[in-house]
């Protein structure tokens, strides 16, 4: 028993010496199929080259178009992006964008329920609110038809 405690203590000390654990690296632009960013006060969308040559292009364009509209309605691109600081705000901005994307995907033949659930999980992950994924799935079902 003493040997086990010594091993656990040594492992704990090693973990502390290694520094804080990181679950994942910081997201980069190339991690996303499309990104809307600000350029001289205007919302500008960039879609990855591999997506522009695929069937996903229309879905991603629909999604990012919502973000451009949100930025314009918010009173400016920088102000809109600066407002995305909480899980609630991220969910509020992503839900209509994924809804637009879902409509295009379903029109192309994607399974409605499975795609809706997949997008709800993505919103949950992006917002850092995985514990709310069932609520987000319900909202997606109720608000996106």
Regions found by a protein language model. Give the residues of each.
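Long, well-structured alpha-helical subdomains associated
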Residues: 90, 102-145
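Post-HEXXH active-site segment of zinc metalloproteases
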Residues: 55, 71-101
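Active-site recognition of the HExxH zinc-binding catalytic motif
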Residues: 59-72
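Short pre-active-site segment immediately N-terminal to the catalytic Zn-binding motif
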Residues: 45-60
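Cleaved targeting-peptide boundary
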Residues: 24-32
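Sec/Tat signal peptide C-region and signal peptidase I cleavage site
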Residues: 19-23
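Bacterial N-terminal signal peptides
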Residues: 6-17
């Amino acid at each position: 028993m003493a040997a086990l405690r010594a091993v656990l203590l040594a492992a704990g000390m090693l973990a502390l010496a290694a520094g804080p654990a990181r679950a994942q690296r910081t997201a980069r632009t190339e991690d996303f199929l499309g990104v809307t960013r600000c350029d001289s006060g205007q919302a500008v969308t960039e879609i990855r080259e591999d997506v522009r040559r695929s069937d996903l292009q229309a879905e991603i364009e629909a999604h990012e178009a919502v973000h451009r509209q949100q930025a314009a309605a918010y009173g400016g691109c920088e102000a809109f992006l600066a407002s995305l600081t909480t899980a609630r705000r991220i969910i509020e901005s992503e839900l209509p964008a994924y809804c637009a994307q879902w409509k295009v995907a379903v029109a192309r033949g994607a399974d409605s329920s499975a795609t809706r659930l997949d997008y709800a999980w993505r919103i949950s992950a992006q917002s850092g609110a995985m514990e709310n994924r069932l609520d987000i799935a319900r909202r997606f079902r109720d608000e996106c038809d």
